[in-house]
Amino acid sequence: MEPSWLQELMAHPFLLLILLCMSLLLFQVIRLYQRRRWMIRALHLFPAPPAHWFYGHKEFYPVKEFEVYHKLMEKYPCAVPLWVGPFTMFFSVHDPDYAKILLKRQDPKSAVSHKILESWVGRGLVTLDGSKWKKHRQIVKPGFNISILKIFITMMSESVRMMLNKWEEHIAQNSRLELFQHVSLMTLDSIMKCAFSHQGSIQLDSTLDSYLKAVFNLSKISNQRMNNFLHHNDLVFKFSSQGQIFSKFNQELHQFTEKVIQDRKESLKDKLKQDTTQKRRWDFLDILLSAKSENTKDFSEADLQAEVKTFMFAGHDTTSSAISWILYCLAKYPEHQQRCRDEIRELLGDGSSITWEHLSQMPYTTMCIKECLRLYAPVVNISRLLDKPITFPDGRSLPAGITVFINIWALHHNPYFWEDPQVFNPLRFSRENSEKIHPYAFIPFSAGLRNCIGQHFAIIECKVAVALTLLRFKLAPDHSRPPQPVRQVVLKSKNGIHVFAKKVC
């Protein structure tokens, strides 16, 4: 009796394995194809530009991303579906009424962006959802109350002055500056002093250069991964050349944050041994360590690591982006720069002292800062995965399961809500004009239930940096190297942000 085809197959396990793999692959392709058809049906009320069947709208990313948004908003006023590859779609929202409904809900972060950011930042406030997010936010909230923020102003001022001292040395040889490099080091110095009680100046000893390099590369690779649908798969990404580089920098980041935590634990042990009665200011890291010691079940070592990573990253990278673009705008528009300088000089004199009370007494400078944040919002978009259906004000609906991007850049440049959106006009934010702005048309720090917990910290640092910088330097743009905005988790420039600096007489 001849063996059956099944017996023949069983006699060749390698062939059986190949058949099994092909069957699983076919099953996955069918599943993805069915999901694609479901998404197309779900989005039939929302027209979109033609997409390649395999690459999707890849031609929009990343170089032409911001140019394309302007064209899309004219043709698709509220929102537009954008495809990344054949099976991944992001529903990009640029209408404030749409954004308002979305940001008042409690939908979780989108699966793809959540996974990519979590792979190096960890499960902290930026990536958490639900009850755990609420718990963590409650834990860190005391670190951002008004009394704490007032103390931070002195430390921020020290860091800014240190940066400006370095500028004086630099421009003696070369008046050209690349802002992001200098400002990033300054904001890291500031967050390390304010949140982690770091002694000394990072700007002088350059001990954190490796950390800055790691964050820069991890941000860049994360954005590239987001735009490459093949790299959405963890296994494919892990064995890619980018995945190998990512792993190296991620390890460096982890080692650094671990050292920050361990150093503080050792410092606290030493203080206990010395039985010192001298009171020390509690900082952000103290709050986290206290939460861990009091409730190890709800706040683990991994949670501690994640929040340290989150606040080191968010506390310096987003703020350095904001300050760099603000200084660039003021360099580009000298009449506004001079008006800010006059206002600050009248308020602060030589700038030897800047206090909490001063920050509310610079209205024109504040308007300029807001207009810069409108034009160059540090965070380009916010992602959500709809966990229940939604109906928008115009009657169109989406089912649960759709990934939504609230496109902050596009919201801030939407010609239906901003007159001449590309024009730098600080008077948009004057007292009388502010009342006319849709509350969800300007959201540089998000809005609604999950707004940025550190937004007041960021605004204070922006004001301190701008005030002290303009008192000492006149800035002018380097027209030979105009910046090229690019999204790398936060908004940066592909070729840096170059200006000329001249000492104020």
UniProtKB/Swiss-Prot annotation:
GO BP: arachidonate metabolic process; lauric acid metabolic process
Segments in the Cytoplasmic topological domain: 1-9
EC number: 1.14.14.1, 1.14.14.130
One GO MF term attached to the UniProt entry: heme binding
Keyword Endoplasmic reticulum: yes
Ranges annotated as spanning the membrane: 10-30
Subcellular locations according to the entry: Endoplasmic reticulum membrane; Microsome membrane
Gene Ontology CC terms: endoplasmic reticulum membrane
Stored InterPro entries: Cyt_P450, Cyt_P450_CS, Cyt_P450_E_grp-I, Cyt_P450_sf, Cytochrome_P450_Monoox
Heme in keyword set: yes
Binding site for heme: C452
UniProt entry keywords in alphabetical sequence: Endoplasmic reticulum, Fatty acid metabolism, Heme, Iron, Lipid metabolism, Membrane, Metal-binding, Microsome, Monooxygenase, Oxidoreductase, Signal-anchor, Transmembrane, Transmembrane helix
Pfam (any one): p450
Catalytic reaction list: an organic molecule + reduced [NADPH--hemoprotein reductase] + O2 = an alcohol + oxidized [NADPH--hemoprotein reductase] + H2O + H(+); dodecanoate + reduced [NADPH--hemoprotein reductase] + O2 = 7-hydroxydodecanoate + oxidized [NADPH--hemoprotein reductase] + H2O + H(+); dodecanoate + reduced [NADPH--hemoprotein reductase] + O2 = 8-hydroxydodecanoate + oxidized [NADPH--hemoprotein reductase] + H2O + H(+); dodecanoate + reduced [NADPH--hemoprotein reductase] + O2 = 9-hydroxydodecanoate + oxidized [NADPH--hemoprotein reductase] + H2O + H(+)
Signal peptide: none
Record protein name field: Cytochrome P450 4Z1
